[in-house]
């Protein structure tokens, strides 16, 4: 059984017991979260889609921790003008363990 959820503007295919890295959520470590935007659920070989979401389905999980991804360097320059800009960015994420798919 798997489900496709939407959170943080992205879609994730999850199964029970999976550990996924999501865009940062406003939840404390150790707390439980529920994802109501379930786009599709596959149960016993039957795949059901929503239009755009399934109203009766939800996915629950537990927040393991928060963190930041690897550093990405953004470097901009203008040729022959001696203009250089170097900037770094680390995207925050939330690590979630999927506990149950309710369908």
From Swiss-Prot:
InterPro entries: bL21-like, bL21-like_sf, Ribosomal_bL21, Ribosomal_bL21_CS. PROSITE patterns: RIBOSOMAL_L21. The keyword Ribosomal protein applies. One of its GO terms (cellular component) is cytoplasm. GO terms for molecular function: rRNA binding; structural constituent of ribosome. SUPFAM superfamilies: L21p-like. Pfam families: Ribosomal_L21p. One of its GO terms (biological process) is translation. Keywords: Ribonucleoprotein, Ribosomal protein, RNA-binding, rRNA-binding. The keyword rRNA-binding applies. This protein binds to 23S rRNA in the presence of protein L20. Part of the 50S ribosomal subunit. Contacts protein L20. Belongs to the bacterial ribosomal protein bL21 family. This is Large ribosomal subunit protein bL21. It comes from Ruminiclostridium cellulolyticum (strain ATCC 35319 / DSM 5812 / JCM 6584 / H10) (Clostridium cellulolyticum).
């Amino acid at each position: 059984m798997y489900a496709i959820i939407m959170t943080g503007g992205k879609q994730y295919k999850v199964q029970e017991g999976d550990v996924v890295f999501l865009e940062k959520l406003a939840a404390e470590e150790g707390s439980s979260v529920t994802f109501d935007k379930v786009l599709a659920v596959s149960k016993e070989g039957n795949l059901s889609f929503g239009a755009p979401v399934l109203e009766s389905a939800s996915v629950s999980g537990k927040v393991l921790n928060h963190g930041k991804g690897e550093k990405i360097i953004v470097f901009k320059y203008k040729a022959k003008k001696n203009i250089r800009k170097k900037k770094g960015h680390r995207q925050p994420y939330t690590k979630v363990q999927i506990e149950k798919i309710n369908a």
